[in-house]
Regions:
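Walker B catalytic acidic pair
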Residues: 187-189
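C-terminal lobe/lid and adjacent interdomain/linker elements of RecA-like ASCE P-loop ATPase modules
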Residues: 199-275
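Phosphate-coordinating catalytic segments in nucleotide- and nucleic-acid-processing enzymes
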Residues: 2-181, 248-275
Protein backbone atom coordinates (compact mmCIF):
# COMPACT_ATOMS: atom_id res chain seq x y z
CA UNK A 1 0.00 0.00 0.00
CA UNK A 2 0.88 3.66 -0.19
CA UNK A 3 3.36 4.79 2.45
CA UNK A 4 1.78 6.91 5.15
CA UNK A 5 4.18 9.68 6.07
CA UNK A 6 4.53 13.35 6.92
CA UNK A 7 5.51 14.01 3.29
CA UNK A 8 1.82 13.78 2.42
CA UNK A 9 1.30 17.01 4.35
CA UNK A 10 4.53 18.97 4.10
CA UNK A 11 6.87 19.42 1.13
CA UNK A 12 10.09 17.95 2.55
CA UNK A 13 12.48 15.20 1.48
CA UNK A 14 13.60 14.22 4.97
CA UNK A 15 12.25 14.78 8.46
CA UNK A 16 15.16 16.97 9.58
CA UNK A 17 13.89 19.76 7.32
CA UNK A 18 11.04 20.30 9.78
CA UNK A 19 13.47 21.63 12.37
CA UNK A 20 15.10 25.07 12.46
CA UNK A 21 18.45 24.80 10.65
CA UNK A 22 17.92 21.03 10.59
CA UNK A 23 18.72 20.70 14.31
CA UNK A 24 16.75 17.60 15.31
CA UNK A 25 18.08 17.76 18.89
CA UNK A 26 15.87 20.77 19.57
CA UNK A 27 12.16 19.90 19.72
CA UNK A 28 9.54 21.82 17.79
CA UNK A 29 7.14 23.34 20.32
CA UNK A 30 3.68 24.77 19.63
CA UNK A 31 1.81 26.33 22.56
CA UNK A 32 -1.83 27.41 22.70
CA UNK A 33 -3.65 28.37 25.90
CA UNK A 34 -2.68 25.71 28.47
CA UNK A 35 -1.74 23.07 25.92
CA UNK A 36 1.49 22.24 24.14
CA UNK A 37 2.51 20.01 21.26
CA UNK A 38 6.12 18.92 20.81
CA UNK A 39 7.57 17.28 17.73
CA UNK A 40 10.65 15.04 17.99
CA UNK A 41 12.43 12.49 15.86
CA UNK A 42 13.69 9.07 16.90
CA UNK A 43 14.85 6.01 14.99
CA UNK A 44 11.25 5.14 14.06
CA UNK A 45 10.35 8.58 12.71
CA UNK A 46 8.40 11.67 13.76
CA UNK A 47 6.62 11.65 17.13
CA UNK A 48 4.19 14.20 18.57
CA UNK A 49 3.79 14.70 22.33
CA UNK A 50 0.58 16.41 23.45
CA UNK A 51 0.47 18.03 26.90
CA UNK A 52 -2.99 19.05 28.11
CA UNK A 53 -4.01 21.52 30.82
CA UNK A 54 -4.99 18.65 33.13
CA UNK A 55 -1.36 17.42 32.99
CA UNK A 56 -2.25 14.49 30.77
CA UNK A 57 0.59 13.72 28.35
CA UNK A 58 0.20 11.57 25.24
CA UNK A 59 2.94 10.65 22.76
CA UNK A 60 1.95 9.28 19.37
CA UNK A 61 3.70 8.54 16.08
CA UNK A 62 2.78 11.18 13.50
CA UNK A 63 1.01 8.57 11.35
CA UNK A 64 -1.36 7.67 14.20
CA UNK A 65 -2.07 11.29 15.05
CA UNK A 66 -2.94 12.76 11.67
CA UNK A 67 -3.38 10.04 9.10
CA UNK A 68 -6.48 7.92 8.66
CA UNK A 69 -5.54 4.31 8.08
CA UNK A 70 -7.72 1.23 8.19
CA UNK A 71 -6.23 0.39 11.60
CA UNK A 72 -7.00 3.69 13.31
CA UNK A 73 -10.03 4.87 11.35
CA UNK A 74 -12.50 4.37 14.21
CA UNK A 75 -10.38 6.30 16.68
CA UNK A 76 -9.55 8.99 14.15
CA UNK A 77 -13.12 10.17 13.66
CA UNK A 78 -13.82 10.52 17.37
CA UNK A 79 -10.46 11.41 18.93
CA UNK A 80 -8.90 13.69 16.35
CA UNK A 81 -11.07 16.38 14.74
CA UNK A 82 -8.14 17.83 12.74
CA UNK A 83 -8.24 16.88 9.07
CA UNK A 84 -5.79 18.20 6.47
CA UNK A 85 -6.84 18.02 2.84
CA UNK A 86 -4.47 18.34 -0.11
CA UNK A 87 -5.82 18.02 -3.63
CA UNK A 88 -3.94 15.02 -5.10
CA UNK A 89 -2.27 14.78 -8.49
CA UNK A 90 -3.76 11.28 -8.83
CA UNK A 91 -6.81 9.98 -6.98
CA UNK A 92 -6.34 6.57 -5.40
CA UNK A 93 -9.53 4.72 -4.54
CA UNK A 94 -10.03 3.49 -0.98
CA UNK A 95 -13.03 1.37 0.00
CA UNK A 96 -13.20 2.56 3.60
CA UNK A 97 -16.82 2.76 4.77
CA UNK A 98 -16.89 6.15 6.48
CA UNK A 99 -19.16 9.11 5.86
CA UNK A 100 -16.54 11.88 5.64
CA UNK A 101 -13.81 12.56 3.09
CA UNK A 102 -10.67 10.65 4.01
CA UNK A 103 -7.64 12.91 4.66
CA UNK A 104 -5.31 13.89 3.21
CA UNK A 105 -6.15 13.11 -0.43
CA UNK A 106 -9.82 12.13 -0.48
CA UNK A 107 -9.30 8.55 -1.60
CA UNK A 108 -12.98 7.81 -0.88
CA UNK A 109 -14.22 10.89 -2.78
CA UNK A 110 -16.49 8.99 -5.15
CA UNK A 111 -18.36 7.26 -2.33
CA UNK A 112 -18.66 10.42 -0.21
CA UNK A 113 -20.17 12.43 -3.07
CA UNK A 114 -22.93 9.85 -3.51
CA UNK A 115 -23.86 10.35 0.17
CA UNK A 116 -24.11 14.15 -0.05
CA UNK A 117 -27.54 14.96 -1.47
CA UNK A 118 -27.04 18.73 -1.55
CA UNK A 119 -23.73 18.35 -3.39
CA UNK A 120 -25.28 15.97 -5.92
CA UNK A 121 -28.10 18.44 -6.49
CA UNK A 122 -25.64 21.28 -7.06
CA UNK A 123 -23.54 19.22 -9.47
CA UNK A 124 -26.67 18.28 -11.39
CA UNK A 125 -27.54 21.99 -11.80
CA UNK A 126 -23.99 22.93 -12.88
CA UNK A 127 -23.76 20.28 -15.59
CA UNK A 128 -27.34 20.90 -16.72
CA UNK A 129 -26.23 24.34 -17.96
CA UNK A 130 -24.06 22.52 -20.51
CA UNK A 131 -26.68 19.89 -21.43
CA UNK A 132 -24.73 17.30 -19.46
CA UNK A 133 -25.81 14.99 -16.64
CA UNK A 134 -24.03 13.99 -13.43
CA UNK A 135 -24.14 10.20 -13.00
CA UNK A 136 -22.52 7.67 -10.68
CA UNK A 137 -21.30 4.42 -12.20
CA UNK A 138 -21.96 1.84 -9.46
CA UNK A 139 -19.93 -0.78 -11.32
CA UNK A 140 -16.66 1.20 -11.39
CA UNK A 141 -17.62 3.31 -8.34
CA UNK A 142 -16.81 6.51 -10.23
CA UNK A 143 -18.42 9.87 -10.88
CA UNK A 144 -19.02 10.40 -14.59
CA UNK A 145 -20.58 13.04 -16.79
CA UNK A 146 -23.08 11.87 -19.39
CA UNK A 147 -23.91 13.45 -22.73
CA UNK A 148 -26.95 12.13 -24.60
CA UNK A 149 -26.26 11.85 -28.32
CA UNK A 150 -29.74 10.75 -29.36
CA UNK A 151 -30.95 7.47 -30.87
CA UNK A 152 -30.35 5.80 -27.51
CA UNK A 153 -26.63 6.61 -27.54
CA UNK A 154 -24.72 8.26 -24.71
CA UNK A 155 -21.18 9.55 -24.29
CA UNK A 156 -19.60 9.14 -20.82
CA UNK A 157 -16.84 11.46 -19.61
CA UNK A 158 -14.83 10.09 -16.65
CA UNK A 159 -14.29 12.27 -13.57
CA UNK A 160 -10.58 12.71 -14.32
CA UNK A 161 -11.36 14.18 -17.74
CA UNK A 162 -13.65 16.99 -16.60
CA UNK A 163 -12.30 20.50 -16.04
CA UNK A 164 -9.73 20.87 -13.26
CA UNK A 165 -11.82 23.64 -11.71
CA UNK A 166 -14.81 21.29 -11.33
CA UNK A 167 -12.72 18.42 -9.96
CA UNK A 168 -11.25 20.70 -7.28
CA UNK A 169 -14.62 22.21 -6.45
CA UNK A 170 -16.09 18.74 -5.93
CA UNK A 171 -13.11 17.73 -3.74
CA UNK A 172 -13.31 20.72 -1.39
CA UNK A 173 -17.10 20.82 -1.23
CA UNK A 174 -17.12 17.11 -0.36
CA UNK A 175 -14.61 17.77 2.44
CA UNK A 176 -16.71 20.61 3.86
CA UNK A 177 -20.12 19.01 3.54
CA UNK A 178 -19.11 15.56 4.82
CA UNK A 179 -17.51 16.82 8.05
CA UNK A 180 -19.03 18.02 11.32
CA UNK A 181 -17.40 19.36 14.48
CA UNK A 182 -14.01 19.23 12.78
CA UNK A 183 -11.05 21.49 12.10
CA UNK A 184 -10.39 21.41 8.35
CA UNK A 185 -7.05 22.47 6.88
CA UNK A 186 -6.89 23.50 3.20
CA UNK A 187 -3.86 24.54 1.19
CA UNK A 188 -4.67 27.08 -1.52
CA UNK A 189 -8.14 25.77 -2.42
CA UNK A 190 -8.24 28.38 -5.19
CA UNK A 191 -5.38 26.78 -7.17
CA UNK A 192 -6.16 26.06 -10.85
CA UNK A 193 -9.72 27.31 -10.38
CA UNK A 194 -11.93 29.82 -12.19
CA UNK A 195 -12.94 32.68 -9.79
CA UNK A 196 -16.74 32.09 -9.86
CA UNK A 197 -16.16 28.50 -8.73
CA UNK A 198 -13.73 29.61 -6.01
CA UNK A 199 -16.66 31.57 -4.57
CA UNK A 200 -18.73 28.37 -4.42
CA UNK A 201 -16.09 26.90 -2.09
CA UNK A 202 -15.70 30.00 0.09
CA UNK A 203 -19.48 30.25 0.40
CA UNK A 204 -19.59 26.69 1.73
CA UNK A 205 -16.84 27.58 4.21
CA UNK A 206 -18.78 30.63 5.40
CA UNK A 207 -22.01 28.63 5.75
CA UNK A 208 -20.35 25.75 7.60
CA UNK A 209 -21.13 26.64 11.20
CA UNK A 210 -20.06 23.29 12.66
CA UNK A 211 -16.49 23.32 11.36
CA UNK A 212 -13.45 25.53 11.86
CA UNK A 213 -11.06 26.21 8.98
CA UNK A 214 -7.36 26.92 8.60
CA UNK A 215 -6.65 28.01 5.03
CA UNK A 216 -3.51 29.12 3.24
CA UNK A 217 -4.34 31.32 0.27
CA UNK A 218 -2.87 33.75 -2.22
CA UNK A 219 -6.27 34.64 -3.63
CA UNK A 220 -7.80 38.09 -3.14
CA UNK A 221 -11.14 36.50 -4.10
CA UNK A 222 -11.01 34.12 -1.13
CA UNK A 223 -9.90 36.84 1.29
CA UNK A 224 -12.46 39.34 -0.01
CA UNK A 225 -15.37 36.88 0.31
CA UNK A 226 -14.39 36.05 3.88
CA UNK A 227 -13.88 39.70 4.86
CA UNK A 228 -17.20 40.68 3.31
CA UNK A 229 -19.35 37.93 4.77
CA UNK A 230 -17.58 36.47 7.81
CA UNK A 231 -15.33 39.17 9.29
CA UNK A 232 -16.53 38.63 12.88
CA UNK A 233 -15.44 34.97 12.70
CA UNK A 234 -12.24 35.65 10.77
CA UNK A 235 -8.59 35.85 11.80
CA UNK A 236 -5.98 36.60 9.15
CA UNK A 237 -2.31 35.80 9.73
CA UNK A 238 0.37 37.09 7.41
CA UNK A 239 3.69 35.26 7.06
CA UNK A 240 7.10 36.68 6.30
CA UNK A 241 10.70 35.49 6.25
CA UNK A 242 13.13 37.51 8.36
CA UNK A 243 16.63 36.67 9.59
CA UNK A 244 16.27 33.05 8.53
CA UNK A 245 12.99 32.53 10.39
CA UNK A 246 9.34 32.39 9.40
CA UNK A 247 7.44 35.21 11.12
CA UNK A 248 3.65 35.09 11.62
CA UNK A 249 1.63 38.23 12.40
CA UNK A 250 -2.10 38.47 13.09
CA UNK A 251 -3.93 41.36 11.44
CA UNK A 252 -5.80 43.72 13.77
CA UNK A 253 -9.47 44.65 13.30
CA UNK A 254 -8.53 47.96 11.68
CA UNK A 255 -6.09 46.17 9.37
CA UNK A 256 -8.85 43.78 8.27
CA UNK A 257 -10.84 46.80 7.13
CA UNK A 258 -7.80 48.11 5.23
CA UNK A 259 -7.36 44.73 3.58
CA UNK A 260 -10.96 44.79 2.40
CA UNK A 261 -10.42 48.24 0.89
CA UNK A 262 -7.37 47.02 -1.04
CA UNK A 263 -9.55 44.40 -2.76
CA UNK A 264 -7.79 42.65 -5.64
CA UNK A 265 -4.58 44.60 -4.92
CA UNK A 266 -4.18 43.15 -1.40
CA UNK A 267 -1.33 40.80 -2.21
CA UNK A 268 0.64 43.62 -3.83
CA UNK A 269 0.52 45.52 -0.52
CA UNK A 270 1.11 42.90 2.18
CA UNK A 271 4.30 44.66 3.28
CA UNK A 272 2.03 47.40 4.68
CA UNK A 273 0.78 44.96 7.32
CA UNK A 274 4.13 43.30 8.07
CA UNK A 275 5.97 46.37 9.35
Amino acid sequence: GKKKSIQQFIRIENDAELFFNGNIDQSISVKADDMEAKVDIDAKGVNVTLSYSDKEIITLPFSNLLLSTKKNIDDFSTVNPFKSYFYPTIFEKDKVSINYLLPPDGSNLMTVVTQQNELKKELTEIFKEYDLKYVFDTNSQEIKIMKEKGSGEIFLIPFHSIADTLQRMIFYKAAIESNQNSVLIFEEPEAHSYPPYISKITQDIINSEQNQFFITTHSPYVVNDLLEQAEKDLAIYLTDFKDGETIVKRATSSELQEMYEYGADLFFNTETFLK
